Amino acid sequence: MFLHILCLLAGQALADDYRPVFHFVPEKNWMNEPNGLIKIGSTWHLFYQHNPTANVWGNLNWGHATSSDLVHWTHEPLAITSENGIEAFTGTSYYDAENTSGLGTSDNPPYLAWYTGYFPSNGTQDQRLAFSIDAGETWTKFEGNPVISAAQEAPHDATGGLETRDPKVFFHADSGKWIMVLAHGGQNKMSFWTSVDAKRWSWASDLTSTQVPGLPSAVKGWEVPDMFEVPVHGTDKTTWVLIFTPAEGSPAGGNGVLALTGSFDGTVFHPNPVNVSTLWLDYGRDFDGALSWENLPDSDGHRILAAISNSYGANPPTNTWKGMLSFPRTLSLHQSQTGQYFLQQPVSNLDTVSTPLVSVKNQTIAPGQVLLSSVRGTALDIRIAFSANAGTVLSLAVRKAGSQETVIQYRQSDATLSVDRTTSGLTSYDPAAGGVHTAPLRPDASGVVQIRALVDTCSVEVFGGQGEVVISDLIFPDETSDGLALQVIGGTAVLRSLEKFPRLGAVL
């Protein structure tokens, strides 16, 4: 019965223009990267780049949605609007707990949001401020905008202020100052600015590709910075993390999201040498412009991250909406004998809307056997743990019917995890919409490989191991492609555990 209800819900979502069941999408029209992610009280706030009047990029405002669990979302009115010929580009939010900005009171400190003001008439970009004194429900633009003008940017920007955007702002307690990180796109650099009141800013330093030891030369076009301090699990230390989205050089081609670690003294970020094997936060094509939620307790020991799942502009075959939020994931940093590495997992709130559907333990699967062929579903959470003989390929096909399928595969011979979209459904909308995306994934110390696949109406997000690697891809299969098949090639595998959960209920 649960599966039947799920298939009906997922079918309704697909019939409604590929709308997902448990991922956020706008009610209508265009969405790109998330903005200003912040938790206020028990409410998660999602702001995002949004064109409310058309299904293409342009006329960008801050869309707004709220949630109590990061699974179910409520659409809210626009937060920061495009007006007077100035669009509201990407930015971030932060709680001004001490009211250093003077935009609230000591009894009711404000929430602040910095964003890039974009002038379509001439391409100018400057930095602007808005504030909220009603817990993020409504936002007022600062009357002294811009807080950093294009003229002020010009000495630090090769284009004279035409390519300075995406402010990431946080309060740095050790220096007692606000820090702003700005991206400079094709110049492959970030600039760092400081302020004592969140309104008046001074340039402090630049970070360029030549200052990042070991950064591959193919990584170009730096966009959408995020920066924060996290504990290093396995030690008693903390470190700083700088995330950004390069336009080129990612494992799957096109935009990708990488993370640098290092130290920060309030003025200069000093990056550690890059370990290419742990550089990328996603090996798929569709994880772009990632940001993390602010105002979480330090005791959590992790950040919660989300990105836009779309690297094809207006090309995907959705007619009433464009752009989907990746499912929120935790991000934590760990220390091993060989170095530091990140782990990512879907937020645990997903478990609260799931009911176990299939459970298998300690079963050997040999070539010729096909498991799960009688199971149907288009919105699923599949978790597999297995050990494989030499030369074994374990293959999990999802959204399968006839010749159509998306194949998640693990190859023992070269220890790789992959997602194959070659026959996943509609791919003609963009030259990059098909193909195979691969990530390195070694078994754990006991020889067990773990795979977790989140499957929704038009996406797969595959987490390998404890979350050492992730592959996120959009897919557009037929509505009737709802089958699964689990099999092995070239050897046997022992399924230590297999669990399959349906997603119960739509997101919105």
Swiss-Prot record:
GO terms for biological process: sucrose catabolic process. InterPro entries: ConA-like_dom_sf, Glyco_hydro_32, Glyco_hydro_32_C, Glyco_hydro_32_N, Glyco_hydro_beta-prop_sf. GO terms for molecular function: sucrose alpha-glucosidase activity. CDD domains: GH32_Inu-like (cd18622). This is Putative glycosyl hydrolase ecdF. Its EC number is 3.2.1.-. Keywords: Glycoprotein, Glycosidase, Hydrolase, Signal. Glycans are attached at N99, N122, N275, N362. It comes from the Eukaryota.
